[in-house]
Amino acid sequence: MTDDPISPSMALLPAGLRDLLPPDAEHEARVVGRLMKEFTRHGYERVKPPLIEFEEGLLSGPGRALAKQTFRLMDPISQQMMGVRSDMTLQVARIAATRMPKSPRPLRLSYAGQVLRVKGTQLRPERQFGQVGVELIGGMQVEADAEVVLLAASALAAVGADGVTIDLTVPTLVPTVCRALNLSEAETRCVRDALDRRDTAAVAAIGGPAGDLLVRIMAAGGPAAAAVAALSAVDLPTVAEPDRWRLTEVVKLLTAAAPHLNLTIDPVEQRGFEYQTGLSFTIFARGVTGELGRGGRYRSGGDGEPATGFTLYTDTVLRAIPGPPPPRRILLPHGTPYAEGARLRDEGWQTVAVLEPGADLSAEARRQGCGHLWAGGRIQEIQDRP
């Protein structure tokens, strides 16, 4: 305790950072625990990477795509630059490559933790938020792609998310097509910008076979079944066939395993998939602003081991599920034997002990947010509870 007055400035936090208060902090912890339990049920084992790593390791390889979002600081001990993680996926990939290289493949790992980014976005102004996810490392099969999509759907269902849509994409498709058509770097940048804006006229303005083909690819989006049919009718360059084949096969597996899963396809989406190397996906929920998570295929470690996985964002997930139920809090009068309180806690009650005699117990129960009172060896409900 301190006698120093509390300055109003002490309540100010940097932009994009916030305190999570009761009951929301407890609710978040329970939701994260339920998600992790679902991952464990599917054979994924938890790892825990550090919050800060040396910059050289954190931002090497695919990590270069995250450099602009990474806070940096000098380590006073080693005098080397360090980075605060802005994403946990590549940390888990590093663990697989350096700590578990001899573990049997495919390797299934899960994780949960906080990340910090230099800037927020329009849809996610928070700069610190929680990530919960899995990585399946060492599996190139289409079954691996389908497994992580189905796990994301089942984990969200386990915490009560409703109206979930999974939007599939192949962020390597458009770059592959542009290279096959011998488009220049400047033309490819124009294509990417136009596709990001969903500007069909700008794409068509490229002209020639390239413009026509890219417009057809762009138009082949929507519900999965129709999108696969439309994309199959497009005359793609031979080098782009593997991307289309994988997308088609994964949709078949997902449709067979979960026919009621709401699947869509956006074959030209690339934003946010800077280090993905194949089939990827974004997760949305009806009525919720922003994405619940995203995932996809990438190359893990220095040897480029094939991997896929997904990350859920806890702040958005919490907006997509029911709020916390009212707590079962009971007030214990001063002097209540410890054993009685222990028995109530074993029965699922949250006990709040009165620390001094003489209190108005009903008033104290209301003040402490308790809906019940332990009196005379019985549980009494408080009327006009808070």
UniProtKB/Swiss-Prot annotation:
Family to which the UniProt record says this protein belongs: Belongs to the class-II aminoacyl-tRNA synthetase family. HisZ subfamily.
Q: In which pathway does it act?
A: Amino-acid biosynthesis; L-histidine biosynthesis; L-histidine from 5-phospho-alpha-D-ribose 1-diphosphate: step 1/9
**Gene Ontology biological process terms in this record:** histidyl-tRNA aminoacylation; L-histidine biosynthetic process
Per its database record, what is this protein's job?
A: Required for the first step of histidine biosynthesis. May allow the feedback regulation of ATP phosphoribosyltransferase activity by histidine.
What GO CC annotations are associated with the protein?
A: cytoplasm
Q: Would you tell me the protein name for this molecule?
A: ATP phosphoribosyltransferase regulatory subunit
Q: Which Pfam families match?
A: tRNA-synt_His (PF13393)
Q: Spell out the note in the miscellaneous section.
A: This function is generally fulfilled by the C-terminal part of HisG, which is missing in some bacteria such as this one.
Assembly mode: Heteromultimer composed of HisG and HisZ subunits.
Which GO molecular function terms does the record list? histidine-tRNA ligase activity
Alphabetically ordered keywords of this record: Amino-acid biosynthesis, Cytoplasm, Histidine biosynthesis
Supply the SUPFAM superfamilies for this chain: Class II aaRS and biotin synthetases (SSF55681)
As for subcellular location, the record says: Cytoplasm
Indicate where this protein is primarily found: cytoplasm
> What highest taxon heads this organism's lineage?
Bacteria
State the taxonomy lineage: Bacteria, Pseudomonadati, Pseudomonadota, Alphaproteobacteria, Rhodospirillales
